[in-house]
Regions:
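Negatively charged
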Residues: 1-200
Length: 200
């Protein structure tokens, strides 16, 4: 287990797995095909880069629901090919994220409510749910209030690339939600946005 905890070794007491000063966790568990631990106790509040953090983790479905990701700017490929991941991360503060490219690409099981995510700074949603074989949750633009703060969830006004966002070329995606309020005025790339979706 990699839980943050107080330990005493050789008469010295310290906090094991204190990651509170870490800023970059890019690729930390990439290709760790058997890794499946609970990491919910980790203080990741200073992390800015989670690129490919759980990339190609075949069985990972550890609890990370309480993570403070408010400073993270890159979630590029964070769960790419994380085949079994399906934790409730709907309460994550994603307001600083600019890159969600491939974030849930090729996730077989992921199907959680992300309806209150703040995507106002995201510029790339390219392949975000490509071949995500289970995802079918409401992600329309709407006013929400979370923790006393009111904001626009799924604000896509800064997104420039939505290429293959729901493409289901090898694993037809079931996504079939209303997204009629999305602001696509700055999007310059939309090729294969809904290609091979099984229900849309």
């Amino acid at each position: 287990p990699l839980n943050t905890q107080q330990v005493t070794v050789g008469g010295v007491t310290y906090t094991a797995w204190d990651v509170s000063s870490v800023t970059n966790m890019g690729g930390m568990f990439a290709y760790a095909r058997s890794f499946n631990q609970n990491l919910n106790s980790w203080d990741v509040s200073n992390v800015t880069d989670m690129t490919a953090m759980f990339d190609f983790t075949d069985v990972f479905n550890g609890n990370i629901t309480s993570w403070d990701v408010s400073n993270v700017t890159s979630m590029l490929s964070m769960f790419y090919y994380a085949l079994k991941f399906n934790q409730d991360i709907g309460d994550w503060d994603t307001s600083s994220v600019t890159n969600m490219l491939n974030m849930f690409g090729f996730t077989d099981d992921f199907n959680q409510d992300l309806s209150t995510w703040n995507t106002s700074n995201v510029t790339s949603m390219k392949r975000m749910f490509e071949n995500a074989g289970s995802f079918n949750q409401p992600i329309n633009t709407q006013q929400v209030t979370v923790g006393g703060v009111t904001y626009t969830a799924w604000d896509t006004s800064n997104v420039t690339d939505m290429s293959s966002m729901f493409n289901g070329s090898t694993n037809p995606t079931p996504f079939n939600q209303v997204i009629d309020k999305w602001n696509t005025s700055n999007v310059t790339k939309m090729p294969q946005l809904f290609a091979f979706t099984s229900a849309f």
